[in-house]
Amino acid sequence: MSANEIVTSEIQDKVCTISFFNPKGNSLSTLHLLRLTKEFNDVSYNDGINVVVLKSSGDGAFCGGASIDELVKFDRFEKAKEFFFAFGKLLLTMIRCQKPIVARVHGKIVGGGIGLVSACDYAIAKKEASLRLSELTIGIGPFVISPFVIRKSGISAFSHLSLDTQWRDAEWGKNFGLYSKVVDTNEELDQEIKKLADDLSKFNLNSLMKLKEIFWEKTENWEQLIDERAEISARLILSEIASGRLQKIIGNQ
């Protein structure tokens, strides 16, 4: 599967729709991370765009987080850190993108998928969009995404999600600010996304850009923070515990 197939973008009437796909639960590989980062960088400096809609393909999960297929292959610290930093770099690029990002969350979000939604400025979810931070179950932790999740939903929600690794329903996500709205059907989801995107496409771009700055002010030191968190994740993913649990997951697929 080529880079052009896993991430696509389309611009229409000042709305840029970025879509990603992975047949394995819309999980994110290095290729996904790099391509998505490039797309958000390009969008940021395009004056013909007012708003970005982020979506994924298929009827299953919205995002399964980091690709297990990649995590299980790491045997060197440098490569592992490079992957986790790339994940954090994508989220940093999203919050520094000058245009508001609206997430269309049609299904479950797991692990890094929660970080992805947290880095968006508005999220509309379908009732099936349950959520779970599963990192502890594989011997690591949600270190790289933690600043974004805490900023979006608060330390209380983050501690609940990270320590109790059970599923939460979409209403839980809404109550803690991760989702802005929860709807019942795909039709309602598309209608709500279209209405909001259409409205934002007509607003003053300079006003939208200033609002985006305010949403994510005081995050200037996050690149260093992400680098430190990526190092923690890289060391843990190479541990015997993590390796054994990842191998077990792969074996059950």
Protein language model regions, located:
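Conserved CoA-thioester-binding segment of acyl-CoA-metabolizing enzymes
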Residues: 1-55, 92
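A general structural signal for well-ordered alpha-helical segments in protein cores
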Residues: 33, 68, 87, 146, ...
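C-terminal alpha-helix plus adjacent terminal tail
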Residues: 1-13, 22, 45-47, 59, ...
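Crotonase-fold acyl-CoA enzyme core
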Residues: 93-205
